[in-house]
Swiss-Prot record:
One of its GO terms (molecular function) is large ribosomal subunit rRNA binding. Belongs to the universal ribosomal protein uL14 family. It comes from Leuconostoc citreum (strain KM20). This is Large ribosomal subunit protein uL14. Binds to 23S rRNA. Forms part of two intersubunit bridges in the 70S ribosome.
Length: 122
């Protein structure tokens, strides 16, 4: 579960390395976000020459969480880290590559571009 002030690794080549959650989008008073949810975040670490800079406010989609995600068949999946992909307003990724696996739940959430760029979908 991702909440305000959570730090996440960035799983794309947009230039950001780490982001800090400012707000969970999707309703007033919503506290937590899971895989496939969109957040507003600020860039805390960035590499030189990237598309985003330190201090930029960006939107991101969560692709991996440490907390379990329950699937319809009753199974659970979790990852070793919390990670997100920075996206534009039209839900397309800023970067051109995705690093690491992403959860299958993104397929149901209009993020097929992220799923197609990912090296592995779990």
């Amino acid at each position: 579960m991702i909440q305000q002030e959570s730090r996440l690794k960035v799983a794309d080549n947009s230039g950001a390395r780490e982001i800090l959650t400012i707000k969970v989008l999707g309703g007033s008073g919503r506290k937590f976000a899971g895989v496939g949810d969109m957040i507003v975040a600020t860039v805390k670490q960035a590499i030189p020459g990237g598309n985003v800079k330190k201090g930029d406010v960006v939107k991101a989609v969560i692709v991996r969480t440490v907390s379990d995600v329950r699937r319809a068949d009753g199974s659970y999946i979790n990852f070793d880290e919390n990670a997100a992909v920075i996206v534009k307003d039209d839900k397309s990724p800023v970067g051109t590559r995705i690093f690491g696996p992403v959860a299958r739940e993104l397929r149901d959430s209009d993020y097929m571009r992220i799923v197609s760029l990912a090296p592995e979908v779990l």
